[in-house]
């Protein structure tokens, strides 16, 4: 044993002397070296792949299990984009490299169309031909797009005072002798007597009677400036009244823009008229129908005698209309 150890010596080691042990140690060192080299190659490949992915896909796919990272520069740019309302601020953001040039151009265009802050949504309409942009408010009341066509309710009317008296023959004989106190309302017709308010009066009064048959009667008030105190009589067919009502409804439903000069500045007809007394059939052939109403203001009273429901008979009407102070 000593000769063998001496023969081998520390400086004369040979891999063939102990093939099993020497070969085992050598194999282990070779495997570890090859694994280290392979891992280094994989690291280099992973680095190249990550660099290539970052160059070709700058925005990584979002994952529901991974929090999103927001760049502070992009966030500040978004806040500055919201706050920037003028061209000077947009130019300042461009100099600070916080806002792209194309976004600055958009802000410059938007700064030309500033509107006052109002309640409601803002609607921007761009013309297809000229490219001009109109800024409108969705709040029609504040934008005044309806002009004079707002549906304003008329003031409430005080109820009239009405009464009857039985001296029909005396009343008709007296008025039959006076001029412009007797007329015939033909079948299917509506007669409207227009009575303006008088500057020296405070109330309007009416009295009327008919021969043999009743007639419909109602009182309305037209809120319109008075240019003449003359009493006028207007005769219309029932179909004409229906056509006029349909036209009035169409005019109300189709508001006219305030800037349209050709269409004029018509007011809402429904808000112009007040109802003092609705049209009902009155037994004017039995008793004299009388009444009065205090002036609500300046305007014209419309006394309607309605015979549109009668298809066969004409009605002879005796009436007396006056004012008192």
From Swiss-Prot:
The modification N6-acetyllysine is found at residue 169. Residues 159-323 form the GOLD domain. Keywords: Acetylation. The keyword Magnesium does not apply. It comes from the Eukaryota. InterPro entries: GOLD_dom, GOLD_dom_sf, Golgi-PI4KB_interaction. Residues 1-78, 232-267 are annotated as: Disordered. PROSITE patterns: GOLD. PANTHER family: LD35087P, PROTEIN TMED8. This is Protein TMED8. The gene is TMED8.
């Amino acid at each position: 044993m000593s000769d063998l150890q001496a023969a081998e010596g520390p400086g004369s080691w040979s891999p063939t002397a102990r093939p099993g042990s020497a070969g085992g140690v050598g194999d282990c060192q070779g495997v570890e070296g090859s694994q280290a080299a392979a891992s280094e190659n994989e690291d280099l490949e992973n680095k190249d792949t990550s660099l290539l992915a970052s160059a070709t896909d700058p925005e990584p796919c979002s994952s529901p299990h991974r929090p999103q990272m927001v760049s502070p520069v992009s966030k500040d740019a978004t806040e500055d984009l919201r706050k920037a309302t003028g061209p000077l601020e947009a130019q300042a953001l461009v100099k600070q490299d916080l806002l792209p040039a194309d976004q600055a151009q958009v802000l410059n265009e938007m700064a030309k169309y500033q509107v006052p802050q109002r309640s409601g949504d803002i609607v921007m309409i761009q013309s297809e031909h000229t490219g001009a942009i109109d800024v409108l408010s969705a709040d029609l009341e504040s934008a005044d797009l309806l002009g004079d066509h707002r549906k304003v309710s008329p003031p409430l009317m005080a109820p009239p005072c009405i009464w009857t008296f039985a001296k029909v023959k005396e009343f008709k004989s007296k008025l039959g002798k006076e001029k412009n106190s007797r007329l015939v309302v033909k079948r299917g017709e509506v007669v409207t007597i227009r009575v303006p308010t008088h500057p020296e009066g405070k109330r309007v009064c009416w009295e009327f009677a008919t021969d043999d048959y009743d007639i419909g009667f109602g009182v309305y008030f037209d809120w319109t400036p008075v240019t003449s105190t003359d009493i006028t009589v207007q005769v219309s067919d029932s179909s004409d009244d229906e056509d006029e009502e349909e036209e009035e409804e169409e005019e109300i439903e189709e508001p006219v823009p305030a800037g349209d000069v050709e269409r004029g500045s018509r007011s809402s007809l429904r808000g112009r008229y007040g109802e003092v007394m609705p049209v009902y059939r009155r037994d004017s052939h039995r008793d004299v129908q009388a009444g009065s109403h205090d002036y609500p203001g300046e305007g014209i009273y419309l006394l309607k005698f309605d015979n549109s429901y009668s298809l066969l008979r004409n009605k002879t009407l005796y009436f007396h209309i006056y004012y008192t102070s």
